[in-house]
A protein has these predicted regions:
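Short helix-initiation/N-cap motifs at beta->coil->alpha
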Residues: 77-87, 131, 148-150, 164-178, ...
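Ligand-binding cleft/hinge of the Venus flytrap
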Residues: 48-52, 64-73, 136, 140, ...
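Periplasmic-binding protein-like
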Residues: 119-126, 188, 192-235, 251-255
């Protein structure tokens, strides 16, 4: 009986130690492996996408590389669809997610965020000839194109829109431009980049949410040491001019 009790106690202690290591040592794992695993979409220009040569690039990707460098690690970008990125963080496939993840009260209940590295606003996009939708309130009963779990879809639902599920921004705007969706709500910077590359696309902005959305690195709630390290890196990037250089590369024409 005593032997059985000792075995049980040993198992409980080992389980507790394993859980403690998993919950507390993400930064230690990054330091020991030299790899910072970042989940990203790879299909959301200009933040995370593939250039003409097939190389993964974008504003978020370049900021992620700089963060990793300042943590003395190599970034490993693991691509996936938007709807699976947060689940991938939960499952431990990534150490962080960088894909224009907006800070929201709902997400803050379960996750941790770094200091914000982008501040933008949500815009309502319709087909160029659409005169029925002029404000967010006009979305009631209309079809709005979104990835199902992002914060823009939540805004559209709030105004009574029927959601058409998509795989990302380009599909959303294409659905609007071809009339298969009435509208989409999305990030202003993404829209401006889209129009820069496709100036003849028959879409327009009809309204903007002036409450700026803050974008940050998404982390697990218990990764406090990693958050401190990422925040330190972001602060350094902004202080030494690196952030402004990357910003100007992607958004100078939009200023």
């Amino acid at each position: 009986m005593k032997a059985i009790l000792n075995i049980l106690l040993t198992g409980i202690i080992q389980l507790g130690v394993t859980h403690f290591v998993y919950a507390q040592s993400t930064l230690d794992n990054i330091h020991s492996t030299g790899i910072f695993r970042i989940g990203t979409e790879g299909a959301y220009a200009p933040f995370s996408y593939h250039d003409a040569s097939g190389k993964l690039t974008g504003f978020d990707v370049e900021i992620g590389r700089e963060i990793a460098q300042r943590m003395k690690a190599k970034p490993e970008f693991i691509e996936g669809k938007w709807d699976g990125l947060i689940g991938g963080l939960d499952a431990g496939r990534f150490d962080a997610v960088m894909n224009q993840i907006a800070i929201t009260p709902e997400r803050e209940k379960k996750y941790s965020f770094s200091l914000p590295y982008v501040i933008s606003e949500a815009v309502l996009i319709t087909q160029k000839d659409n005169n029925d939708i002029k404000t967010f309130s006009d979305l009631k009963g209309k079809k709005s194109a979104h990835t199902l779990t992002n914060n823009f879809a939540q805004i559209a639902r709030h105004y009574g829109a029927d959601i058409i599920g998509t795989n990302g921004f380009n599909q959303e705007v294409d659905l609007v431009s071809t009339g298969r969706a009435d509208a989409t709500i999305n990030d202003k910077l993404s829209y401006l980049d889209y129009k820069k590359h496709r100036p003849d696309a028959p879409v327009k902005i009809v309204a903007a949410d002036t409450r700026a959305a803050q974008t940050a690195v998404l982390l697990r709630k218990n990764d406090t040491e990693l958050k401190t390290a990422v925040d330190k890196a972001i602060t350094e990037i902004k202080a030494d001019g690196t952030y402004q250089r990357i910003w100007d590369k992607y958004f100078a024409e939009n200023n």
